[in-house]
Amino acid sequence: MTDSNQPMPLQARKSGALHGTARVPGDKSISHRALILGALAVGETRISGLLEGEDVINTAKAMRALGAKVERTGDCEWRVHGVGVAGFATPEAPLDFGNSGTGCRLAMGAVAGSPIVATFDGDASLRSRPMRRIVDPLELMGAKVVSSSEGGRLPLALQGARDPLPILYRTPVPSAQIKSAVLLAGLSAPGITTVIEAEASRDHTELMLQHFGATIVTEAEGAHGRKISLTGQPELRGAPVVVPADPSSAAFPMVAALVVPGSDIELTDVMTNPLRTGLITTLREMGASIEDSDVRGDAGEPMARFRVRGSKLKGVEVPPERAPSMIDEYLVLAVAAAFAEGTTVMRGLHELRVKESDRLEATAAMLRVNGVAVEIAGDDLIVEGKGHVPGGGVVATHMDHRIAMSALAMGLASDKPVTVDDTAFIATSFPDFVPMMQRLGAEFG
């Protein structure tokens, strides 16, 4: 697993203007779901543009261990021959998801609908993350889960339900992972499985279920929520999937281009699902020059080409209801806020505390060690932007790929270089990050 590797420190130095065109890797959320739904479908699923980072590769290995035929046919081109809903076989060994909470939690939902037993495990970071929020609804549906750790943490053994039950479930927090696990388990249950969320979370699972032939209905629920109803026991059919570029990965070169003066870059095929564009909305409110063109779509997911130019940013207040649409982007937004003029307040960030690290504390520490005034007030992050960042600090990444990439983006425009203690975990989501940024003009050493 990745956490057994030697640390790979790296320093980012003040760079000249960034220029060029790039395509960031395929979206991680779509890549996981394409593999899992391809494995649950009947027939062949061809996937192009799959993210070939460690997290997604571990999901591919897990689907193979569960009985699906999963093979790489070319550069980011994959083919899956599925086993059908409830058709998984008991794996011979534990399913190791490395650092991937998404792959692990979605696979738990998929396995919960098959009458098999599977053990789920991961690296030290994933073992520390809460799983009870996934386990609770799956147990209501008839699955049985045994964990030797407090809070239902990994490693755990999951026995899928022989006769899964449809449920109506209200998610305790806005979470696409909880919602998706319940819906994937609900594929094997007769009748209607319903998930109600008070704040709308990413809807990639719903869109892809429809693409594979499931009947799913989404309705508004309250001011910001959704009610999702799935008709169980469909025959999913294999379908082609084109994976758009990951907006969460595009966030790093995007913010780097905004804060490095004179930059002018283009990012192609970036997903523009409205439940993933909170960062772009916020950056534009801050005064960012971000233009989109060539808007199109595949499998229900829109994508576009973005032109991003160096901009003078101002502080803004980010409302808590925006969090689900940009939960993975707050770290790099904090970097933009540090270079802005004025105070930026990001509200309602409690979910950052249970990511690959406590990202709320880690973000504050990343800024403080580089001379930025920052405060945590409850679940709010307050950044005092001064138009520049002193830099000169060493950032502890805590085995978190997004902390590493955020800190490196910051170092490209800070007064003094910024060092990250370990870049190894960048490979989980963006293996080509450093060379791609160097092609745009970034200076690392």
Swiss-Prot record:
Recorded GO MF terms? 3-phosphoshikimate 1-carboxyvinyltransferase activity
Residues given in the record as 3-phosphoshikimate binding sites: 28-29, 33, 175, 177, 328, 355
> For this protein, what reaction is catalysed?
3-phosphoshikimate + phosphoenolpyruvate = 5-O-(1-carboxyvinyl)-3-phosphoshikimate + phosphate
| EC number(s) on file | 2.5.1.19
Pfam families for this protein: EPSP_synthase (PF00275)
Location of region: Disordered: 1-25
Q: Which InterPro entries does the entry link to?
A: Enolpyruvate_Tfrase_dom (IPR001986), Enolpyruvate_Tfrase_sf (IPR036968), EPSP_synthase (IPR006264), EPSP_synthase_CS (IPR023193), RNA3'P_cycl/enolpyr_Trfase_a/b (IPR013792)
Q: In which pathway does it act?
A: Metabolic intermediate biosynthesis; chorismate biosynthesis; chorismate from D-erythrose 4-phosphate and phosphoenolpyruvate: step 6/7
Return the GO cellular component terms, semicolon-separated: cytoplasm
Keyword list (alphabetical) reads:
Amino-acid biosynthesis, Aromatic amino acid biosynthesis, Cytoplasm, Transferase
Q: Where in the cell is it found?
A: Cytoplasm
Q: GO biological process: any one?
A: aromatic amino acid family biosynthetic process
Q: What is its main location?
A: cytoplasm
Per UniProt, where does phosphoenolpyruvate bind? 28, 101, 129, 177, 359, 402
What this protein is reported to do is described as: Catalyzes the transfer of the enolpyruvyl moiety of phosphoenolpyruvate (PEP) to the 5-hydroxyl of shikimate-3-phosphate (S3P) to produce enolpyruvyl shikimate-3-phosphate and inorganic phosphate.
PANTHER family xrefs: AROM/DEHYDROQUINATE SYNTHASE (PTHR21090), PENTAFUNCTIONAL AROM POLYPEPTIDE (PTHR21090:SF5)
Name the family.
Belongs to the EPSP synthase family.
Against NCBIfam families, the record matches this protein to: aroA
Q: Please state what the protein is called.
A: 3-phosphoshikimate 1-carboxyvinyltransferase
| Biological source species | Rhodopseudomonas palustris (strain ATCC BAA-98 / CGA009)
What gene name is given for the protein in this entry? Answer: aroA
